[in-house]
Swiss-Prot record:
Annotated pathway: Protein modification; protein ubiquitination
UniProt catalytic activity: S-ubiquitinyl-[E1 ubiquitin-activating enzyme]-L-cysteine + [E2 ubiquitin-conjugating enzyme]-L-cysteine = [E1 ubiquitin-activating enzyme]-L-cysteine + S-ubiquitinyl-[E2 ubiquitin-conjugating enzyme]-L-cysteine
Biological process (GO), any one: protein ubiquitination
Organism, scientific name: Arabidopsis thaliana
Protein name: Probable ubiquitin-conjugating enzyme E2 37
Domain UBC core stretches: 6-165
Pfam family name, one: UQ_con
Tagged with keyword ATP-binding: yes
Positions annotated as active site in the UniProt record: 99 (glycyl thioester intermediate)
Gene name as annotated: UBC37
EC number of the protein: 2.3.2.23
Molecular function per GO: ATP binding; ubiquitin conjugating enzyme activity
PROSITE patterns found in the cross-reference section: UBC_1 (PS00183), UBC_2 (PS50127)
Disulfides per UniProt: none
Amino acid sequence: MAQAARLSLRMQKELKLLLSDPPHGASFPHLSSAANGSGDFSTFSTIDAQIEGPEDTVYANGIFNLKIQIPERYPFQPPIVSFATPIYHPNIDNSGRICLDILNLPPKGAWQPSLNISTVLTSMRLLLSEPNPDDGLMCEVSREYKYNRQTFDYKAREMTEKYAKVKADGCSTSLQIKNHGDEKSGESGNSVKLKLTVESSLSIAHTVKRETAGRDEQEDGNGKRKAVVGFGEGNSFGNDGIKRSRKKLSLALPSQSQKKDLCGEEELTRGVSAACKENKKPNLNGKKLSLGLKQPCNDTLASFRTSAAKSDNNRLSRKLSLRSPLGELNEVSKPEVLAQTDMKLEMNQNEDARSLRGEFENSVLEETSMAESIVVLDSDDSGQEEEERVSSSRSRLSLAKRRVLKCRP
């Protein structure tokens, strides 16, 4: 009896406070009508409240109905609060139950007798603006809120638009919890329609993709067309009339590019390097080039040899024509003279060959003078050998002259 009296006094104070200084964004339509009719506040065991969705959230411009039940041991027990309007929230389930620490007793909750209904409604609006997905009632919604925020925002706005929007005449479209089953069935019907539209759009995209793929396969089957036309475009039209284009780039390697790696060696054997003309470094593969031409080019040496042989024949014919007075000599001295002339011709041929070889070496060195080419100079021994050959040839010439002078009468 004493507990009921204390509860009546407490409720009268709180309800008057709610009417005089309501929380921000909260209203009590039934409570205000009872106050105008001078009703008894002590008989209120259930309070119907309305809260507005916080601004800059997915629940903005929405009005949500709440049902507040006052227990007999209030304020030592927290009030029982539930949402009568469907809402998409991690901490509020489909039946309207709320997961909030202020609505539970310690040690799990944080309710205290010093708190009141105004504090509870303020905490509700704070929960709408800042959900707690780590302690949620709806696991799927909590997962969407954490990892797929865009999908969560879309669904929350859609449900707010459907159930919590205010009509033009000022009446709210939110329904009570008793009609929640019908609303759920209507929501499921809309979800089915949404799925059908999504599937139809996917099928259209799939058919368009298949058409473009078949067109690309036909173009790939014709090899000549792919080699000539390197950039193709396939256009297709969907059911919505939007033109979709798919561009394709095909690269064909020409046969001439496969022979570029061998251009250095082929041009080097011909005497002229194409890489030098294009200011490129030839790929010599570490081969050494010596002044003695240890690895001469076959074509160039053959040409020089033929030219040297022709010049030697011409010189031999000229010398023989000039040596015609030797016929007046004795028959015994003719073989000696011929031997001497043969020796001189051999020496001249050697000197001509050396001069031609030096000219060829100089030309090759001028063409292949690069940073990567390695020139190996002949040692001093080769120079000494050349000097010995020259001295020996000179001594032979002097001996031949002496013999000729002796043979003359």
